[in-house]
Design a protein with these regions (language model features):
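Generic protein-terminus/edge-of-domain signal
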Residues: 1-60, 77, 98-112
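Glycine-centered loop/turn positions within well-structured domains
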Residues: 48, 73, 196
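Conserved metal-binding segment of the jelly-roll/cupin
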Residues: 59-72
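Ligand-binding loop in jelly-roll beta-barrel domains
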Residues: 70-98
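Short, Lys/Arg-enriched, Trp-marked, Pro/Gly-tolerant hinge/linker segments that flank
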Residues: 112-120, 135-146, 155-192, 196-197
Length: 199
């Protein structure tokens, strides 16, 4: 529910820690708002558009967008069932000190574009799809299982953000870049210094 035109409040009914939906409330389309909780959007078809802090994201199948507390955002285009949404208190993440200290970094990279050739992208999407499926299951301790999946999701997202940050910083190489550079240096050294055949 929007209050004062911009603030969204949620009601955690029945003591559930997660609000899960496989459709968007169409009354929120093109309405800029913010809220004090985390929201994860999963695109289940192409052609969705979401804006966070005046940056537009065109979301296609399996793309993921994370909206953090205080982010001004709006869903500009979707069909209602083309986006899945999960909402939960940020305290579920910030209770873990390591996670709390990484929140500023995570909020710099809210968009996870799906790459079908990337195994980590597939893992992240599968975690979220199981997360959504578990909500409607009859499993015992399902919120415990959902919380475990949520932490696993954010562990992978956090590692992705660290990698993106390291790639953007000059002079910091990730292990793959470092190994590739060493191999290239070795090949160059061999080609320059060993011009006669080895016997």
């Amino acid at each position: 529910m929007l209050r004062n035109g911009y603030y969204e409040s949620i009601d955690i009914n029945g003591g559930n820690n997660f609000i899960i939906s496989k459709e968007i409330d169409m009354s929120f389309i093109n309405k800029v708002h913010w809220h004090p909780f985390v929201e994860i959007l999963v695109s289940v078809s192409d052609g969705n558009e979401v804006e966070i802090n005046f940056t537009k994201y065109n979301m296609n199948l399996n793309d993921i967008l994370i909206i953090y507390p205080g982010d001004l955002h709006a869903i500009n285009r979707c069909s209602g069932t083309s986006l899945w949404v999960a909402q939960f208190s940020s305290e579920m993440l910030s209770i873990i000190n390591e996670m709390s200290s990484q929140m500023p970094l995570l909020s710099q990279y809210p968009y996870l574009k799906y790459d079908p050739s990337c195994a980590d992208c597939d893992r992240i999407v599968l975690i979220l799809k199981e997360f959504f499926a578990t909500r409607n299951s009859d499993a015992h301790l399902k919120e415990v299982h959902m919380y475990a999946m949520l932490l696993s999701f954010f562990e992978k997202v956090g590692q992705n953000c660290i990698n993106l940050r390291n790639e953007a910083l000059p002079g910091i190489e990730n292990p793959k870049q470092n190994m590739t550079k060493k191999m290239a240096d070795a090949c160059l050294y061999i080609s320059e210094n060993y011009t006669s055949p080895v016997r």
